């Protein structure tokens, strides 16, 4: 089993700013406020996709941003909503908080959606701030910031394809050509002790390929590391049996084929039910007679026979597309992950907290901090609106309960100001 991991930074779109505007009609030169609202920022949505098998696409980019909302306009026109950003991931992907490693979401189904970062709300235009005592408000709200997160995508890969065959038939070379893996390649027997895994991309599709360590006679009885090797084969969807059809090391490819198949059957008879593609490798070394003999004997007994040369890459592309098409014909099974996960659920916190620290009175909480962010301190009416909301929410009363006096320092988010009633 192999863990595919990707770290990505996410930034949802900022909400558009509300507009400060007034009606200017021909017969109404002193019309009322007409500033429209800003559009909401785009959210970032994670979607499960059964056709994606790996996290390979997230190795090329690390930062993803959704579109911001458009600003409000005159005549009460709303700004354009920012477009949501869709991130497709394989079914079975765990979405984790990067810093705490806690599970935020487990993508279990095809087309399942989860909003990982919500876009900021658009700011209200000045049309919303008209009142009996404020007929021409000259302020509007800025848009909210979008949510930001750094997450880790984690996918447990069970190899889709198992490369099997005796040592030195060219499996490691083939894996390195077909995928992003860089296995150690040496011309001696039994060198690989763990499966080398590679991710292969064919057009828009991808699959995981495992070079199963070289099997030997007696593997089904545990000789060498037989049982350890064979257990990896059980988890694959299809087998690709690689043969040195040239017999370059003095071996008979037909005898080799029968030996490996015998070991598979002895270990687990169900392995005979797996789809098997047979790859006749090293055709560049001259193997016409062996190819003819093999095809005559096995054409009607195996799913496909492909002639290739890993050394010259002849027909390797053909093999990759054949594997991808074969995998498409096999129903996916997502029941392989039976671990229990502890999910992280955010506790609902109060809208704000007020505390005293030395000579400062500190107000904390996303609702109040966002209100500060959306206040234009250059405009008296905007500041006056802020003060009214702080009173309505009970912030002013809690500050008084802590003993605040005129002239004392108040800190909300990144903003500091003196308190005066």
From Swiss-Prot:
Compartments where located: Cytoplasm
Record flagged with keyword Glycoprotein: no
Cofactor(s) annotated in UniProt: Mg(2+)
Residues the record lists as binding Mg(2+): 172, 192
GO cellular component: cytoplasm
Region Disordered: start-end pairs: 21-40
Chain ranges of the OBG-type G domain: 159-328
Enzyme Commission designation: 3.6.5.-
Keywords: Cytoplasm, GTP-binding, Hydrolase, Magnesium, Metal-binding, Nucleotide-binding
GO molecular function: GTP binding; GTPase activity; magnesium ion binding
Predominant location category: cytoplasm
Record-listed GTP binding positions: 165-172, 190-194, 211-214, 281-284, 309-311
Record-stated family: Belongs to the TRAFAC class OBG-HflX-like GTPase superfamily. OBG GTPase family.
Primary role: An essential GTPase which binds GTP, GDP and possibly (p)ppGpp with moderate affinity, with high nucleotide exchange rates and a fairly low GTP hydrolysis rate. Plays a role in control of the cell cycle, stress response, ribosome biogenesis and in those bacteria that undergo differentiation, in morphogenesis control.
PANTHER family, alphabetized: DEVELOPMENTALLY REGULATED GTP-BINDING PROTEIN-RELATED (PTHR11702), MITOCHONDRIAL RIBOSOME-ASSOCIATED GTPASE 2 (PTHR11702:SF31)
Assembly, per entry: Monomer.
Annotated protein name in UniProt: GTPase Obg
Organism, scientific name: Finegoldia magna (strain ATCC 29328 / DSM 20472 / WAL 2508)
């Amino acid at each position: 089993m192999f863990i595919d991991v990707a770290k990505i930074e996410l930034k949802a779109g900022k909400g558009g700013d509300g507009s400060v505007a007034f009606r200017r009609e021909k017969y109404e030169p002193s019309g009322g406020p007409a500033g429209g609202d800003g559009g909401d920022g785009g959210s970032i949505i994670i979607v499960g996709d059964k056709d994606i098998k790996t996290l390979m696409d997230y190795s090329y980019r690390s930062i993803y941003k959704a579109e911001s909302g458009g600003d409000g306009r005159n005549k009460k026109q709303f700004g354009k909503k920012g477009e949501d950003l869709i991130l497709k991931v394989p079914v079975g992907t765990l979405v984790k908080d990067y810093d705490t490693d806690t599970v935020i979401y487990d993508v279990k189904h095809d087309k399942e959606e989860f909003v990982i970062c919500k876009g900021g709300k658009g700011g209200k235009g000045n049309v919303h701030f008209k009142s009996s005592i404020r007929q021409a408000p000259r302020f509007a709200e800025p848009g909210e910031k979008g949510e930001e997160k750094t997450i880790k995508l984690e996918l447990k890969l069970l190899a889709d394809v198992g490369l099997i065959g005796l040592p030195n038939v060219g499996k490691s070379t083939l894996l390195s050509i077909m995928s992003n893996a860089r296995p150690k390649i040496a011309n001696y027997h039994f060198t690989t002790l763990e499966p080398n895994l590679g991710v292969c991309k064919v057009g828009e599709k991808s699959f995981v390929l495992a070079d199963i360590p070289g099997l030997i006679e007696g593997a089904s009885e545990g000789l060498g590391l037989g049982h350890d090797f064979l257990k990896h084969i059980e988890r694959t969807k299809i087998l690709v049996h690689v043969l040195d059809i040239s017999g370059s090391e003095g071996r008979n490819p037909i005898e080799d084929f029968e030996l490996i198949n015998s070991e598979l059957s002895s270990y687990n008879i169900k392995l005979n039910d797996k789809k098997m593609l047979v790859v006749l490798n090293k055709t560049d070394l001259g193997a016409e007679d062996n190819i003819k003999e093999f095809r005559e004997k096995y054409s009607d007994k195996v799913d496909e026979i492909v002639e290739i040369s890993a050394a010259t890459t002849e027909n390797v592309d053909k093999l990759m597309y054949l594997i991808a098409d074969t995998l498409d014909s096999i129903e996916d099974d997502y029941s392989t992950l039976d671990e229990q996960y502890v999910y992280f659920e955010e506790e609902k916190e109060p809208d704000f907290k007020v505390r005293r620290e030395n000579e400062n009175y500190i107000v904390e909480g996303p609702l109040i901090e966002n209100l500060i962010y959306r206040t234009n301190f250059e405009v008296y009416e905007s500041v006056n609106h802020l003060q009214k909301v702080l009173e309505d929410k009970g912030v002013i009363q809690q500050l008084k309960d802590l003993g605040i006096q005129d002239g004392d320092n108040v800190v909300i988010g990144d903003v500091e100001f003196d308190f005066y009633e």
